[in-house]
């Protein structure tokens, strides 16, 4: 497996430090608002990477934080006349609603800044003690010039970094690039006691502290959006490596922006679309497919056409699942699995070929666009097989069905959650029973009953089709 490492600027073969186990950290949201589609992209991208690693038999320790102490959270709390942590808790709950809708699996751990203040203070104290940080008027700053490797991740010159950093006029700083590790308390803001006086953590020290606490130095993958490369991830590296003297993270993966008219989608620009609003118009799994249909490092320029195409693509995959479900029900219901003679079939072999194409795509810097193409090809092969034969080879069908479910559901997460699967299985079982009753009526030449069943099903949105292999059904 090869992944593009932002740190080195090239694809590198990925092997975890600990055989069979991957340690992975992804920057989570600042919890002051509902998430927009740009926030959702790293959620889906790194969830799918985690799923794929698990499919390849890795045990993944996946940590994603919540930034529940931040200027934005405090400002929203002032606007709504509530405590900052109350605001944060509300939007954490909303985050999980959107994540569940998009079929994002729960991370192993969701550490919150507010629960790690002691660890953050200890990390800052170490940096001060080692000479990488200084105290000024109750604030504590990281001294960038003391860390010679600063700029290694973003490949920026000092001048470019000054232009790109969130630099405020501050005469307490020795260098405009120096960044806050600890902010002295201000009236009306949450604060904690520290060796430097009451205050709260800076943004960057929060992530590096939690990552080191749960994953240790030299962990395997650190992920996030490309907008975090500088200054956030650059600063994380400086803080962590200045503390430990060890590599912070080995592979740095960054997803591309979602743009609107070629401009980055962001709350600050007001050109964002909330996930909760998009889900009122498009199905959640179609939105997930939309985010996976482009290579994760490439930008996506948002428009309805792409989401409509994703809806159609999802319908193609769901149609194949329906055909597979019908075929399995017919085999199970008729005992055909033991009575139908096996016939030479290329389906099983073709399913394995396409599985290897899928793996090859995912192993090449996690290319979900190519992997989806292999999945669509497999759907086409299954459809052709089921629509073109009156005698099913159960073993071939089972192989193709398992492969299809693993790649589309287990890895890409496009086939819904357990509740929907149970509902689909229940519907398939009920339809199998109804079709059996109708078939018995036809055998008795009770055409009125058979026609009534067909007509009532049509009223309920289910269309029957009589084929040489027996009746089939589909949602209208």
From Swiss-Prot:
A motif ('HIGH' region) lies at residues 29-39. Monomer. Its main location: cytoplasm. This is Cysteine--tRNA ligase. SMART domains: DALR_2. One of its GO terms (biological process) is cysteinyl-tRNA aminoacylation. NCBIfam families: cysS (TIGR00435). GO terms for cellular component: cytosol. It is found in: Cytoplasm. CDD domains: CysRS_core. GO terms for molecular function: ATP binding; cysteine-tRNA ligase activity; zinc ion binding. The gene is cysS. Its cofactor is Zn(2+). InterPro entries: Cys-tRNA-ligase (IPR015803), Cys-tRNA-synt_Ia_DALR (IPR015273), Cys-tRNA/MSH_ligase (IPR024909), CysS_C (IPR056411), Rossmann-like_a/b/a_fold (IPR014729), tRNA-synt_1_cat_dom (IPR032678), tRNAsynth_Ia_anticodon-bd (IPR009080). It holds the Pfam family CysS_C. A motif ('KMSKS' region) lies at residues 264-268. Belongs to the class-I aminoacyl-tRNA synthetase family.
């Amino acid at each position: 497996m090869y992944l593009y490492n932002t740190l080195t600027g090239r694809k590198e073969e990925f092997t975890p430090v600990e055989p069979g186990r991957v340690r992975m950290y992804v920057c989570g949201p600042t919890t002051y608002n509902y998430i927009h589609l740009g926030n959702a992209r790293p959620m889906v991208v790194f969830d799918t990477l985690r799923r794929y690693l698990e499919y390849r038999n890795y045990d993944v320790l996946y940590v994603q934080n919540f930034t529940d102490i931040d200027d934005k959270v405090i400002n929203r709390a002032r606007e709504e006349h509530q405590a900052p942590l109350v605001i944060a808790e509300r939007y954490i709950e909303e985050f999980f609603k959107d994540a569940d809708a998009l079929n994002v699996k729960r991370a192993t751990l969701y550490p919150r800044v507010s629960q790690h203040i002691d660890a953050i203070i200890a990390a800052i104290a170490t940096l001060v003690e080692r000479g990488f940080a200084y105290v000024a008027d109750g604030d504590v700053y990281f001294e960038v010039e003391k860390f010679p490797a600063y700029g290694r991740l973003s490949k920026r010159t000092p001048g470019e970094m000054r232009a790109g950093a969130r630099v405020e006029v501050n005469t307490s700083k020795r260098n405009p690039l120096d960044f806050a590790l600890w902010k002295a308390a201000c009236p009306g803001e949450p604060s904690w006691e520290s060796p430097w006086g009451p205050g709260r953590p800076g943004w960057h020290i929060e992530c590096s502290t939690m990552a080191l606490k749960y994953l240790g130095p030299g962990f395997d993958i650190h992920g996030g959006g490309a907008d975090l490369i500088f200054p956030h991830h650059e600063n994380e590296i400086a803080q962590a490596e200045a503390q430990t003297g060890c590599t912070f993270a080995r592979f740095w993966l960054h997803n591309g922006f979602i743009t609107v008219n070629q401009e980055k989608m962001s709350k600050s620009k007001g050109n964002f679309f909330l996930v909760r609003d998009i889900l009122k118009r498009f199905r959640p799994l179609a939105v997930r497919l939309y985010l996976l249909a482009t290579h994760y490092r490439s930008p996506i320029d948002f428009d309805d056409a792409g989401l409509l195409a994703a809806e159609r693509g999802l319908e193609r995959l769901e149609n194949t699942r329906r055909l597979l479900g019908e075929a399995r029900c017919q085999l199970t219901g008729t005992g055909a699995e033991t009575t139908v003679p096996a016939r030479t079939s290329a389906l099983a072999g073709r399913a394995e070929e396409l599985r290897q194409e899928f793996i090859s795509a995912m192993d090449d810097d996690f290319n979900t666009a190519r992997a989806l193409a292999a999945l669509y090809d497999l759907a086409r092969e299954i459809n052709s097989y089921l629509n073109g034969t009156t005698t099913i080879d159960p073993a071939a069908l089972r192989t193709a069905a398992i492969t299809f479910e693993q790649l589309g559901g287990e890895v890409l997460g496009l086939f819904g959650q357990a509740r929907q699967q149970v509902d689909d299985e229940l519907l398939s079982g009920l339809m199998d029973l109804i079709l059996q009753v109708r078939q018995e009526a036809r055998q008795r030449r009770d055409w009125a009953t058979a026609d009534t069943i067909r007509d009532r099903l049509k009223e309920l949105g289910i269309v029957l089709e009589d084929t040489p292999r027996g009746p089939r059904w589909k949602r209208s």
